[in-house]
Amino acid sequence: MFSRDLTLARYDAELFAAMKQEAQRQEDHIELIASENYTSPAVMEAQGSVLTNKYAEGYPGKRYYGGCEYVDIVEQLAIDRAKQLFGADYANVQPHAGSQANAAVYQALVKPGDTVLGMSLAHGGHLTHGASVNFSGKMYNAVQYGIDANGFIDYDEVERLALEHKPKMIVAGYSAYSQVLDFARFREIADKVGAYLFVDMAHFAGLVAAGVYPNPVPFADVVTTTTHKTLRGPRGGLILAKANEEIEKKLNSAVFPGGQGGPLEHVIAAKAVCFKEALQPDFKEYQQQVVKNAKAMAQVFIERGFDVVSGGTENHLFLVSLIKQEITGKDADAALGRAFITVNKNSVPNDPRSPFVTSGLRIGTPAVTTRGFKETECRELAGWICDILVDLNNEAVVDGVREKVQAICARFPVYGK
C-alpha cells in the first residue's frame, strides 16, 4: 500500500531538487519561445491524477479493457469541449503530441510515395510538413512551397506547384510564420487538383479558439493542433474535422491501433480542463493581448533598425533577421540567455548559416502575456533585447538587463500565492 505521506521531496530528493530549480527558473526568466507557455494549476492537477493508472485502449464506449466507465466520461468531456471550442463535428483527443496527430493524418489520407505539398522548414514550416529528415519527407514525395522576398506565402506559387505536381494532400500551417493564412485560397487550390487540405494549427490554435484568428475547420478536410503553445494546456495533440464518416473512421484507426496503443487519460483530462478554460470570456482577452504584445515588440525591433521578416506580425510570433547585423542566432540566443531571457535561434529566409547556427531569432508572446505583461512591458523588454544585440559581447549590458529582468519577473510572477 502506498502512503500519501511519502512525498517526492522525501523519496527522491535529487529529482525533486532539479524540479524545484526548474520551477525557479520559470519564475526568474522571461520566456519568449513561441511554442512555450505556462499551464494552470488545474491542468497540472489533472495531469498528475490517478487517471495515469488506467489503461483504456479503444474509444469511449468501445474499450478493450474493463473498468473504463469513468475514463469514458473524462475522454468524452474532452471530445465534446474540443468540438464546441473549434466548431468541429469530429474530435480525437488521444494523440500524444502534435507530430503523432500529424502522422495519423498522413496514415489516414495518403499512402507512402504519394505527393504531399507543404511549407518548407527553411521558410517557416514544420518537420512534419515534408522535411527530408522527418517521416513526412522520407515516406512521401514531399514538394515544398515557401515565402516570397517580402516574407509572405506566395499563393500563386503554391497553386503553380499544385498544378505541376498534383499532390494528394496539401499541408497548411507553420512553426515560424507571422502572418494570417488564407484558408479559402488553400481550399481553392486543393479543389483544383483534387487534393485533401490538411491544416496544422498547432501554433495558432489558441488564437483560433478565441476568435482572433480565422478558423480553418470549415475549410479543411482535417485540422490538427497541439494542446500546449497558445492553447495553454498540457503537452499533447488533437485532431479535428467536419462531419465525414469515412474520414472519421480512417482517422480513428490511424490513431488507434495504427499509431498508438493506450491513450494517456491523465493528459486527456488535462486537455479537458484546458478546453474549458479556453471557452471562458477571459481567454479571448488573453489571446487579444498576445497579439497586441507581439505587435508592440516587433515594432520596437523595426524602430531600432532590425529586419523583422514580413515587416511585422499578425499573430503571436515574429522572426528577427540578424543578417544585416552580422550576428548569428546562436550567439544572440546565448547572450540573451545570460540575461535570463529565453528565445530560440531560428533560420530566416535565404539564411546563409546552418540550422545549428542560424541568422535569426524567433520571438513569441504567449508566455509573457500569461504572466500579465501588456504592451508597455513588452516594448520595454524588446528594448532590452535590442540593447544586448547591438553590443553582444558587452557583459556589463547583459548584467544590467538581467537585473531588470529579475525585477520585472518579481512584479509579474507566473504562479501567485
Swiss-Prot record:
Entry binding sites for (6S)-5,6,7,8-tetrahydrofolate: L121, G125, H126, L127, S354, P355, F356
| A biological process from GO | tetrahydrofolate interconversion
Q: Give the N6-(pyridoxal phosphate)lysine positions (modified residues).
A: K229
List, alphabetically, the InterPro entries matched: PyrdxlP-dep_Trfase, PyrdxlP-dep_Trfase_major, PyrdxlP-dep_Trfase_small, Ser_HO-MeTrfase, Ser_HO-MeTrfase-like, Ser_HO-MeTrfase_PLP_BS, SHMT-like_dom
Task: Give the source's domain of life in one word.
Answer: Bacteria
Note the Gene3D superfamilies from the entry: Aspartate Aminotransferase, domain 1, Type I PLP-dependent aspartate aminotransferase-like (Major domain)
Which pathway does the record list? One-carbon metabolism; tetrahydrofolate interconversion; Amino-acid biosynthesis; glycine biosynthesis; glycine from L-serine: step 1/1
Q: What is this protein called?
A: Serine hydroxymethyltransferase
Question: Whose protein is this, by species?
Answer: Azotobacter vinelandii (strain DJ / ATCC BAA-1303)
Q: Print the organism lineage.
A: Bacteria, Pseudomonadati, Pseudomonadota, Gammaproteobacteria, Pseudomonadales
